[in-house]
Amino acid sequence: MRKDIAMRYLLTGNEAIALAFYINGGQFASGYPGTPSTEILENLTKYSGNIHSEWAPNEKVAVESAIGASYAGVRSIAVMKHVGVNVAADPIFTVAYTGINAGLIIITADDPGIHSSQNEQDNRHYAKSAKIPMFEPANSQECFDFVNHAFKLSEQYQLPVFIRLTTRVCHSKSIVITSKHHRSIHLSIDKSSRFDPIPSISIKLHESLEHKLLDIANSNSYYCEELTNSQIGIITSGMSYNYVKEVFGNSVSILKLNLIFPLPINKVKQFCSKQKRIFIVEELDPFIEEAVKALGINCIGKDYIKCYSELNPYIIRKAFFPIIENEPSSNVPATTSKPFCPGCFYNTFFGVLSSYKNVIISSDIGCYSMSSKEPYNAKDIAICMGAGFSIAHGIQKSLDMLHSDKRVIGLMGDSTFFHSGITSLINCVYNNSNPILIILDNQSTSMTGMQDNPGTGYTLDHNPTTKIDLVKLLDSLNVKNIRTFNPFNKDQTIQALDYALLLDELVVLIAQGYCTLKLAKSTKKEASNNA
């Protein structure tokens, strides 16, 4: 890449974020794999000579590590999907008070339409609740540009800054014209008392934070205004802007918000004063709509446009022009294929597990989430990462009090166990619980693209590292009944489950297999290297 001139690339939003982080002097990146954000960190490995990028065990650790890098004077980024922000909320809320040293960006990749998640929470609310500025790009060029804006704003106000992506922005490709390189950004360590938020200091930090947000709101110039002779004005942001432009072209006035929190209050008032009617077009919750109404401005939003799933030009067109012919058909034929890949040990394991009837199965988030599908029907409940064991504990304790003979089986993968299952297991040990807990160890974070984790022995950039031994870890937690088995072997799987069901106490089974896709990928790469 030439460092002295601008270049043109065709990039996804995720690729643009990674490139911009490199060009703008970012040096530390941490995150946890999760669609649609995964490819950001994977692309940062291209710049391993300049950037330290890593998979963290979970999102909380990723944010805390990025805070540490910022404190040390290094520009940093923490990357996660929307539900990951729930895990990282504790440090996020406090670092807004203490502020940062070198620029700190937190990526939240939201999933309107629930393409690969368990919910479609709107993380714009985190910006308001945690009092952290938030950018929302609409395309890959803006993903690239907003990293630069975010770092400047972060360091100007000593605040972390959110960049909110959505699935379509993350994975859609568009032209990106890059700026010149400006790397080698490093600040000295800031040892001021604000980084020790005891109550007497925190109350002052909160007051300072409110003043910062007010100043940002009054000086916010991160918007695009398109004025026409129309008396209709639309306020929008992110991917919704693209849909608005496709439907209306230049026939209405548009105020596109790039920094969606805090709002550019003066510009919003000025724009609305020129229009006879104001409409708000946004995906999911009425976040912008409520903020505009709080300014005393009459506007129309979710009265016409749904507050669930993602938008598209057809939905917006129908909201404004109700009588439309040729409505797109939603009669998509259902798939009848098995939910797991050919050769995956989940086929054998869940085939066996589904034959056990007097059990309740508490599952988790991963490829095994699809065990509820035919022909297995081997899942009763799943909530979030790490909950498989915790919920199993709660159910089993309750059934025991009710003198039920049902046993509860908790399931999770190896990566999920390292993410947030360890504390759930400790809870079972500490509170003398007796569910059957099964770790499906396929040596991979497979559902998000076969990434490594603390149990694989390799880092994000494929360098060898210390491998966490699950059996030794469980033994150190004083788990008395530990058994490993080969889940590709039907007889071993049956024997392991029967063994666990005979014991009226806590049992942890480890299915020691491998991801067939990852194995095939590794074999192909090895053959290519040897060619």
What does each model-found stretch correspond to?
Residues 1-140, 168, 227-228, 251, 372-510, 514-524, ...:
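Thiamine diphosphate
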Residues 2-18, 23-24, 137-340, 345-348, ...:
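Flexible, low-complexity linker and terminal segments
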Residues 43-49, 245-255, 472-480:
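Short helix-loop-beta junction
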Residues 49-57, 98-109, 189-194, 430-443, ...:
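A glycine-rich helix N-cap at a beta->alpha junction
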